[in-house]
Amino acid sequence: RRTRLVPPYMWDIAHSLACAGIADRAFFDIVFGSVTSSIRHWPASGLSRLAWAASKCRLLSPQHATTISREARKREFGGFGAQDLSLLTWALAAASHPDGDVFGFAFSLDWRQAAPESLSQVYQAHLVSKLELPANGLALPPPVASSGRAHFLEAARQARSSDLHRDVSKAFERLQIEHINEYTTDDGISIDIAMPSSKLAVEVDGPWHFLRTYAEDTKEPNGSTVFKRRLLQAAGWRVLPIAHFEWEPLGNEKARTSFLRRCLQPLAPQLLGR
């Protein structure tokens, strides 16, 4: 049945799979096959939603990213509204396939009436340009970047601290390591547990940070999680991810404290033994 699917079902299903964290490589291969053979029939919204979904599932290859970016340029971005471009720029940024023409056009738009989510997405593309590609000279205008930063940070703050997060924080307390929960960097990136003086960011990753199949969870972080780690590293932070499937099986405080000590030893040994 998959082979008979035609747009718009393809990008709708791809979007739904990404929202559920299901990385169905076979399905995405079929969808990109349709893109390759009939891209001129795909609307801008379909291409952008597909790029976002594939990037979220870590299935946006350099070839696929180039195909979609080239088509957007070929159309001179006709039909690409603010939401479409925010999805596309985020997808390219998150997958490490930035396109200067796409970014440049998106950054030149008037974003004042854009939805908060769109501003947050294009701001993350702005961070890639700022932190990883400063030589390209592409950036959002300062007022837009400021607004995007605020919406990006607000979205992170809406995610409440989990029991897992609090438990990891308690382990730091047992080790007598000073730390800050829900720390915000200058660029507006929220860190679960931070030691600013050591530039160490601890990211506590629950199940929603990982991809899954139709039958079970995997241990592969999703595109958003990998992207955030990369932005933190580009900003000069060392990142220590602590996954729920590593932490929760440790049955007592002693085991969890020992685990945390082992994780910290290669990254920040100066924090230990205080």
What are these regions (language model features)?
Residues 1-274:
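Eukaryotic RNA-binding helical-repeat scaffolds
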